[in-house]
């Protein structure tokens, strides 16, 4: 636990504009100025029409799919994982690995340059909903809840992005 807290202290936190996060996994903090207005301005009713009930629960209400239930957990195809809500590219299959946790795991987000995630499709937000701090991962374009990132992944990044399959859309590489 102490190792996790030390790792979280070193990560940049993003501040919030406006509305509070709903559901059990959010701290209510949001980033400023990095979200595309057209993607995040959909109403709750519009998201419910666009998404399946499970996709809506996970991405818009900050839920979590059951471990070992996701369609991409054992996917070994080469390609890119996109946001199911807005189609933003998020993770490459090149950085996917088996963590044994029951969710697809990635060592870094697509577009990362070392520790610089400014060119990725994700944002990190502190999540204290379960009584201990952890880092939530959301889509930069539409604020979809994707999962969490933990400091116990493989080298060289040491990160484990633990992502809900239902929040992703896989696009295989063209041969």
Swiss-Prot record:
Binds 1 zinc ion per subunit. Zn(2+) binds at residues 83, 86, 139, 142. It is found in: Mitochondrion. Keywords: Metal-binding, Mitochondrion, Oxidoreductase, Transit peptide, Zinc. GO terms for cellular component: mitochondrion. Residues 1-42 form a transit peptide. It catalyses: L-methionyl-[protein] + [thioredoxin]-disulfide + H2O = L-methionyl-(R)-S-oxide-[protein] + [thioredoxin]-dithiol; [thioredoxin]-disulfide + L-methionine + H2O = L-methionine (R)-S-oxide + [thioredoxin]-dithiol. Its EC number is 1.8.4.12, 1.8.4.14. Belongs to the MsrB Met sulfoxide reductase family. Methionine-sulfoxide reductase that specifically reduces methionine (R)-sulfoxide back to methionine. While in many cases, methionine oxidation is the result of random oxidation following oxidative stress, methionine oxidation is also a post-translational modification that takes place on specific residue. Upon oxidative stress, may play a role in the preservation of mitochondrial integrity by decreasing the intracellular reactive oxygen species build-up through its scavenging role, hence contributing to cell survival and protein maintenance. This is Methionine-R-sulfoxide reductase B2, mitochondrial. It comes from Mus musculus (Mouse). The lineage of its organism: Eukaryota, Metazoa, Chordata, Craniata, Vertebrata.
């Amino acid at each position: 636990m102490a190792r996790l807290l030390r790792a979280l202290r070193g990560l940049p936190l993003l501040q919030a504009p406006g509305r509070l996060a709903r559901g059990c996994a959010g701290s209510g903090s949001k980033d400023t100025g990095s979200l595309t207005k057209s993607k995040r301005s959909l109403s709750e009713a519009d998201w419910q029409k666009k998404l399946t009930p499970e996709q809506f629960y996970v991405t818009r209400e900050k839920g979590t799919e059951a471990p070992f239930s996701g369609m991409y957990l054992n996917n070994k195809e080469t390609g890119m994982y996109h946001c199911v809500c807005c189609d933003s590219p998020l993770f490459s299959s090149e950085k996917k690995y088996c963590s044994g946790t029951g969710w697809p795991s990635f060592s870094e987000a697509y577009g990362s340059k070392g520790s610089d995630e400014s060119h990725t499709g994700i944002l990190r937000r502190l999540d204290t909903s379960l009584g201990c701090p952890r880092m939530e991962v959301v889509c930069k374009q539409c604020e979809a809840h994707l999962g969490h990132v933990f400091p116990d992944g493989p080298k060289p990044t040491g990160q484990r992005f633990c992502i809900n399959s239902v929040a992703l859309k896989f696009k295989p590489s063209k041969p």
